[in-house]
Amino acid sequence: MTIRTLDDLLAEEVTGRRVLVRADLNVPLDKQTGQIADDGRIRAVLPTLSALVQAGAKVVVCSHLGRPKGSPNPVFSLRPVAGRLGELLGAPVHFAEDTVGDSARSTVADLADGQVALLENLRFNPGETSKDEAERGAFADQLAALADAYVDDAFGAVHRRHASVYDVPARLPHVAGRLVLREVEVLGTLAGEPDRPYVVVLGGSKVSDKLAVIEALLPKVDRLLVGGGMCFTFLKAQGHEVGSSLLEEEMVETCRSLLERADGKIMLPVDVVAADAFAPDAPHDTVRADGIPSKRVGLDIGPETVAGFAAALRGARTIFWNGPMGVFEMAAFAHGTRGVAEAIATSDAFTVVGGGDSAAAVRALGLDEQAFSHISTGGGASLEYLEGKTLPGIAALES
């Protein structure tokens, strides 16, 4: 089944029509100042919003931010996001103090053609994330009443069966925004027949979080490079000592089985940066990955591993990267992530960064985002797509 697109909606004339755009404005906030720490997700929705503004639509944007547990919490207000969105659009964004209440209704009613409103955090209402279909549906009814058409441009949320993602499209003419369409095209290529050699780089802390995607990708890839905290469970499965490094004991046997079935495709670190403690200023040095001293904790892949991973990436035609190679938030343990990211960025391959912490690392390390073919805005969503799962938000757009 095909998905109707933003261009299909624009062709129908949207001047003066109220268009509800589900965006993913779930940006990280600085814990001290409350300011936006990374506006990448706001920038990602600009092509869709700009097209609607230029077409004269009355644009109503909605999003979640954080996990406020179904009631208003000023810590998770979208007000700062409205300010930044207005700066990026070059025009004021009208902010509604609630999501479907009096403020939302009056703010939307007052919009002129080509103006933009942002509703308060969707998750301030328990109906957004409710598992009760009636409660979720009632909230979806209220949201849908604010608009004449619906655009989903929140790829980072399409794996959630939430009211604004799954239920609202059933109540309004619905299309995919520019971002969602691009994500589906790119991930469809990776899930289908990508150009070979196809090399996947996986990091992050837990094997259990990536097990399903490893199972799905192993038959398709030529090499699978494993770094980050998850590598220590694989090293343990090979019989090596991992000191006090992160270890999922219950996953050791699973990793052993994966290594046996992988037939040499899985490449693990040969050296790691081990520290005396999990702290930015902890004493640390590089040790062999097959014998991490007891009471020491591996916090990054070592330089020999970076060189080996870079060599494995050199001849690739397609590269997918998800998850940092170490604790990149601490400068002493960011070298592995930087080295691998730079190897991917300088590759001639079709390169996809799989959202979440990987996308954050690209920006935090000051790397050129344009050097990558695509940086996904959906961490969990991109992995679930590659696992072959049905994503509720995509299914809703297809219906």
Swiss-Prot record:
Q: What class of enzyme is it?
A: transferase
Q: Which Pfam families match?
A: PGK
Residues that bind ATP, according to the entry? 210, 298, 329, 355-358
State the Gene Ontology terms under molecular function.
ADP binding; ATP binding; phosphoglycerate kinase activity
Q: Where in the cell is it found?
A: Cytoplasm
Q: In which pathway does it act?
A: Carbohydrate degradation; glycolysis; pyruvate from D-glyceraldehyde 3-phosphate: step 2/5
Catalytic activity entry = (2R)-3-phosphoglycerate + ATP = (2R)-3-phospho-glyceroyl phosphate + ADP
Q: Which residues bind substrate?
A: 24-26, 41, 64-67, 123, 160
EC number per UniProt: 2.7.2.3
Please list the GO biological process terms of this entry: gluconeogenesis; glycolytic process
Q: Which UniProt keywords apply?
A: ATP-binding, Cytoplasm, Glycolysis, Kinase, Nucleotide-binding, Transferase
**Cysteines engaged in disulfide bonds, as pairs:** none
Name a GO CC annotation attached to this entry.
cytosol
- Quaternary form? Monomer.
Q: Which family does it belong to?
A: Belongs to the phosphoglycerate kinase family.
Recorded protein name is Phosphoglycerate kinase
What organism is this sequence from?
Answer: Salinispora tropica (strain ATCC BAA-916 / DSM 44818 / JCM 13857 / NBRC 105044 / CNB-440)
